[in-house]
Amino acid sequence: MKEYKSVCPYDCPDACGLILTVDDNKVTKVRGNKEHAFTRGILCPKMAHYERVIHSPKRLMTPLRRIGKKGIGPDQFTPISWDEALERIVENFNHTINTYGSESILRYSYAGTMGAVNSPAADYFFRCIGATSQDRGICSPAKQAAFKSVYGDTVAIKPQEAQHSDLIILWSLNATATDVHILHDVNVAKRNGAFVWIIDTHKTYTYDQGTHHVYVKPGSDGALALGMIHIIHRDGLEDTTFIQAYVQGYDELVRDVLPTFTPEYVSSICGVPVEIIEELAHAYAKAKAPFIRLGSGVSRYGNGAMSCRCINALPAVVGAWQHLGGGLLSSSSSSQYFNKSFMQQPNTPTPSKRMMPMILLGDLLTNPKALLEHGLEDTSGGVPVHSLYIFSSNPAITAPNQNLVRQGLMRDDLFTVVHERFFTDTCAYADIILPATSSAESDDIFNSYGHYTIAASYQAIPPVGESKSNWQVISELAQRMGLDDSFFAMTERELIEHMVRNSSKLSQDEQDAILRGDLVEVALPDNYKMDFKTPSGKIEILNPRESIPLITYTEPYGDDEPFWLIIGNDIRILDSSFCELEFDDSELMKLRMHPDDAALYNINNSDAVEIYNNRGAVRIKVYLDDTVQRGTLVTLGVWWQSQSSDAKVGINAVTASRPTDEAWGSTFYDVQVNIRKV
């Protein structure tokens, strides 16, 4: 029996430190690493039994070739050797390049693993062969764009500072399900007398952590932030000294925007009572060190970036940044501390000028001119995609506008490769399926977007079955495609060492510790919070480089349907990851609805209903819940097709491939539906 230090590989800001117990080449136990500066040995329910994922009987064990129809299931496939699988892929790539042009090949991947080696493993390879590039922002690029708009390259606040705050706002953050370790710091602050305000669209798992709760209408968060600033200015509660020294655009905000956003007007937009808006604004302004932890949900609307810009302005108005415990955490900046760009080989072949935002997968697969029609550059003139390589993602269930995505995946002239651990919904549309390793079976290095700890995670067990890591497969494909580049001959460990040793921001001791497998929390510069790295050197609530320079409220898209659909987080899964596990609940996909709304549609508790709009329809069982806001419907999790109420489509059948106002992010939450009994 032996123990290995590891890291949770999933798309979560916490990137937990793990200890894997291995016996006879099997992981028998997983526990948290108590040495981790942020996760402190605590694991979420999803990772508490990671060994069940690693050694699941559902793991794919060998490459598979489709011999039947697309979109059916595992019985349409037969096992083949790795040699045959790779040769078929190479043969198809070469045929596609010679017949249609290299931009007819598309890679689609996301955050099935967050490792700095295996997440971007295919980037350089597909650039070398001239394939269509992929803009890999689907989760929260609008939120990131908003922080950059206001704060530029300013180093993000450490999450542990929340311990020193006297007022914490968890804004659009269901921390219990998506950022559980911040709650340690929140509870330290609470024990010291801090108040915790939770602002969200519905009652979440995190409800009990709050001392105050505010429920806003979907997409209205920016208006609430402006309403708070209106009150703070009206009552003379802003920090004028800080504003004069460090804020650009406040006078313009006071003159041109704030007069409109009275508490009464904001209440009409947000649905929050005037007295609650007043109480929230005063509590925030009068706190010595208010701390906002901003989640990603608010950014998944058509106005997501602008809403986040408005929220980002709040700590500037009250001067929170100058106090220990004060500020706002959107996402951390730990990726800059080692040479992650090495995986991109930035000084070698340039990307294709045809780049597909992830949200447009269904659009491009069904319409070769889709990028041009969205005003995006496409030097190919709009050639169809004929080869699709998917890894670390399950787009048949997680991509927006699911029916359009599946229509594209069903094309007979589309050759699709899926590299996966389990037979997901996307695998049903593949021509070749390749078995993938778990994080326990490969080497990688991880940073976090929620704290500042960096750690390598080395192989603890041999690959399960014939599985290979993302990097191993890409290296072999590169060799078979005749790419004579020493980069592809490097091992995962060699890549890790190169990225760490070629960092100007890590000391020799820190580099040595990381390569030993130790956890390293990087040191931040003195007074980093007050070093505003923008062109003006100030916090830019007026950014002249933006299409709308001054922060204001813009509306979400909405639809011509009566109910906002809120797709929240289920504590048991992460997007569609962990759906491979067995759950006691026979009804995983559920809908919550306010009883008064249900009465208008003659809907009773536990009725089967259909929610629908012009993009699709989803059958689901409804449960009445008076904590749900009127005019909204709530469902949790993105479950596999086999786990949905009628085993036909998932919840993304009703979501749209419309972009956020900046950065081409997803608008998964900007969706309205109608409802009927079935």
Regions found by a protein language model. Name each.
Residues 69, 209-210, 261-265, 293-298, ...:
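Flexible glycine/proline-enriched surface loops and loop-helix/loop-strand junctions
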Residues 208-216, 437-440, 452-464, 584:
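Short beta-alpha connecting loops at secondary-structure transitions
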Residues 7, 405, 411-415, 419-423, ...:
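Phosphate/diphosphate-binding loops
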Residues 464, 470-517, 576, 581-591, ...:
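Long, contiguous, secondary-structure-rich segments that constitute the structural scaffold
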Residues 119-199, 222-226, 315-428, 437-445, ...:
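Extended redox/cofactor-interaction regions of prokaryotic respiratory oxidoreductases
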Residues 1-235, 273, 391, 599, ...:
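N-terminal export/assembly segments and adjacent metallocofactor-ligating motifs
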Residues 66-79, 84, 230, 235-274, ...:
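N-terminal leader/propeptide and maturation segments of large enzyme subunits in energy/redox metabolism
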Residues 228, 248-370:
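Active-site phosphate/pyrophosphate-binding segments
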